[in-house]
Amino acid sequence: MNLKEEIESRKTFAIISHPDAGKTTLTEKLLYFSGAIREAGTVKGKKTGKFATSDWMKVEQERGISVTSSVMQFDYDDYKINILDTPGHEDFSEDTYRTLMAVDSAVMVIDCAKGIEPQTLKLFKVCKMRGIPIFTFINKLDRVGKEPFELLDEIEETLNIDTYPMNWPVGMGQNFFGIIDRHSKTIEPFRDEENLLHLNEDYELKEEHAIKNDSAFEQAIEEMMLVDEAGEAFDNEALLNGELTPVFFGSALANFGVQNFLNAYVDHAPMPNARQTKEEVDVSPFDTDFSGFIFKIQANMDPKHRDRIAFMRVVSGAFERGMDVTLQRTNKKQKITRSTSFMADDKETVNHAVAGDIIGLYDTGNYQIGDTLVGGKQKYSFQELPQFTPEIFMKVSAKNVMKQKHFHKGIEQLVQEGAIQYYKTLHTNQIILGAVGQLQFEVFEHRMNNEYNVDVVMEPVGRKIARWIENEEDIKDNMNTSRSILVKDRYDNYVFLFENEFATRWFEEKFSDIKLYSLL
């Protein structure tokens, strides 16, 4: 297989959903159908103690949510698929956003009983903003939920995107019989003991079966004919432009509808995309020179070795272990000899990767999120990854003053991997941490204790709004007020932390020559 064929075989996507919609379950079942894992067990193992493949961090195992982004690669048919299992909690939008910068498509998982939920909407907007094609898997059809047309209408109205159902459910909950495949005109029964049923062009059963006289079957056929009469053909270009989402019904927990989805996904999902540089030049995946960017850094994936891994998306060409690359931020050459792939906490050495692949680079502190690595004589850097403005701030210190070394090492590593944002007061050097949501602080506290053996003391600062300053040279000492704190971020930029919107507006009126701005 030549380089062009290798790149065309890559499919890289993220799975997005609201917590408990079945995202991690779907991830596991995709791995199961690909043969990447031997057993697809129940993911939600709070009683059994059995944990999902993609939830490897201890706090994830304890709480049953994904709070980091795992990367899994597997072969299916003639394709090599990279799945990024995004954080499944609403507090982790910043890490999720960075993950979505590294994919070419997304799979949106929706609970049929709940429809579009807040986190789903938030993540969808990020995908829409980036023009990422979205596939929809409506999950838990073996439970009672909303009617199919109601769910499609909700997706179209709430998300402002057209839908195209690729299959259609027959019944729901206890009366769930199976799904009708629109393309093959077949009915796949939910129960294993049933055989595949076939329909003619008029949706009449070719075989004799008791379901023929069932009201749920009759309703499903009527609905399917209504969908067909709408006359809208599947438009792959609209999918690739982010204007249409193909919709699949199924039950991930029951292994039902997942393989049908996977088959359709590899047929219709985009191959690796070009990526824009800071100079607004598109770098094609087929460029022969290697390039890639770091979108995530994760410390202590293996607690025994206290390792640190930088997650890199290969943008163009081919990566070969041992190759020389240039880290553009420092303009220094380096030889990459330690590279790894992932299956959650299982890792193996990567000798070769091409555009679209996600690989891990062992990091001794060289890399930062957003770094560009290039081979050959290329000089460009990719556009920076956006940063979110925190909404919660805490003073933090070590409970035991004898643990200062471990305390500062832990904070440095967790800040570098993007788990938390770092600020420091100007005169007292008090460390203040910022987060998008409360759970980030809980995870930070847990990891400091579990990975660095440091108990931390955290105290709310009473500030909710962070604003950066465009004209830093105009800052004066008298600008600190009882309702604001002047701090520096990890890059030494000045930042004002304000108590509330009123305090922000008061400052802007009093010091009108100071130009404030926020991040995303």
From Swiss-Prot:
One Pfam assignment: GTP_EFTU
What positions does the domain tr-type G occupy? 8-277
Kindly give the PROSITE patterns that the UniProt entry links to this protein.
Answer: G_TR_1 (PS00301), G_TR_2 (PS51722)
Give the Gene3D superfamilies listed for this entry: P-loop containing nucleotide triphosphate hydrolases, Peptide chain release factor 3, domain III, Translation factors
Highest taxon of the source? Bacteria
- Mind listing the UniProt keywords for this protein, alphabetically? Cytoplasm, GTP-binding, Nucleotide-binding, Protein biosynthesis
Gene Ontology terms for molecular function: GTP binding; GTPase activity; translation release factor activity, codon nonspecific; translation release factor activity, codon specific
Could you mention a single GO BP entry for this protein?
A: regulation of translational termination
List all membrane-crossing ranges.
none
Q: Where in the cell is it found?
A: Cytoplasm
The record's InterPro entries line, in alphabetical order, gives: EF-G-like_DII, EFG_III/V, G_TR_CS, P-loop_NTPase, PrfC, RF3_C, RF3_dom_3_sf, RF3_GTP-bd
What the entry lists under SUPFAM superfamilies is as follows: EF-G C-terminal domain-like, P-loop containing nucleoside triphosphate hydrolases, Translation proteins
Q: Return the CDD domains for the record.
A: RF3, RF3_III
Q: Which GO terms describe its cellular component?
A: cytosol
Signal peptide bounds? none
Q: Which residues bind GTP?
A: 17-24, 85-89, 139-142
- Task of the protein: Increases the formation of ribosomal termination complexes and stimulates activities of RF-1 and RF-2. It binds guanine nucleotides and has strong preference for UGA stop codons. It may interact directly with the ribosome. The stimulation of RF-1 and RF-2 is significantly reduced by GTP and GDP, but not by GMP.
Family, per entry: Belongs to the TRAFAC class translation factor GTPase superfamily. Classic translation factor GTPase family. PrfC subfamily.
Instruction: Output the PANTHER family linked to this UniProt entry.
Output: PEPTIDE CHAIN RELEASE FACTOR RF3 (PTHR43556:SF2)
Q: What is this protein called?
A: Peptide chain release factor 3
Q: Which organism is it from?
A: Staphylococcus epidermidis (strain ATCC 35984 / DSM 28319 / BCRC 17069 / CCUG 31568 / BM 3577 / RP62A)
Its encoding gene is what? prfC
